[in-house]
Amino acid sequence: MTPRTRYLVVCLLTALAACGTPPRPAGGPTPAAAPSPAAAPSATTTQGSAVPPITPPAAASPTPAPTAAQLAGRRIVYSYPGPVPPQDLLDAVREGRAGGVIFFSDNTIDPAAFAAAVRQLRQAQQQSPVRWPLLLMTDQEGGRVRRLSGAPELSARQVSEAADPVRAAAEAGAGAGRNLAAAGLNVNLAPVLDVYAAPGNFIDAKQRSFGKDPGDVGMLTAAFTAAQHREGVAGTVKHFPGLGTAPAGANTDEGPVTLADPLTELREVGEAPYPAAIAAGAGLVMLSWAVYPALDAERPAGLSPTVVQQELRGRIGFTGVTVSDALEAGSLAAFGGTGQRAVAAAAAGVDLLLCSGRDTAQGLRAAEALADALADGTLARDGFTAAVDRIDALRAGLR
């Protein structure tokens, strides 16, 4: 442990003590069985008091078992263009065929219209047979990567360069949580855990990395995650097993990226920050679309059972929700269309599929492919329902 890391450990412990008891880990290993949705950990208010999970009204008769289409839809995060949610998205939500919605700048640019859109989506969910709130999410990393105006205004690099970086990270996480919660959102696709290897490389170019030392990155992202979690917003740590060595311009959104990191480097650097951030309350882990030959030379991480099941679930011990990066990414061009990509990711062990092409039809195609794969046995029912159960447990603890 470097002197700087020892210093950050002390700062982190001090910050957590000042904020009260840290939240129960949302995705870390536990000796007990995974909780049912009704028993999932609750979110917290800004004061740290428990927020009870949303529960359904008493029903006169048992709720019918979900259809294959509903189970499949609950694994999809939809997106849409512009300020107004389209009718087909509202219908999917109302019929229990949606897991969540991701928002981009074209959705949020008009605050009044965005507030109306969130109300519409929440009202549609209240009419749904699914008892839990939608996962309403965006990328609010800080600095140059923000979909909502306001906090956190500091980038990850600026946080790491602060006089008290752990305190700055906690303030950034709290600011992100309050900002999203005020807008009616309950999931942040942040913080970034990538440990950058060279100044100006892909992840450092927009100041998205908290540092070059994995111990520092683990401490700072843990502080960010814990503070955000206390505001009632679930954190997503990304991009497993790490994009820190990607050179400038190596963007998986645009095309294939292969990172030839040795296995020891992947584990001692790229994956090293994850246990601390998961223990601090991260409810989701996003998989990278890069290829890592040390783990799987044939498939991007998010399509690789080796990466998802053996590294993340097995070695790291993560039991929460796994989420894909953008399903429309250029790095997946060789892996078929939307439906084929969705089934391949689900087969690898990814729970939640991010259909972020600003087109509801993309999510509907992915859901249809999942439902067909469930019906014909391509995807095993036990694994499929386990993924839905993890998503429902996450939703049950949010507002």
Placement of each model-derived feature along the sequence:
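Sec-dependent bacterial lipoprotein signal peptides
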Residues: 1-17
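Hydrophobic faces of well-ordered beta-strands that scaffold small-molecule active sites
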Residues: 73-80, 99-103, 134-140, 187-191, ...
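Short, acidic/polar
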Residues: 82-94, 169-179, 267-274, 336-344
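Mid-to-C-terminal alpha-helical segments outside catalytic/metal-binding sites
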Residues: 372, 376-399
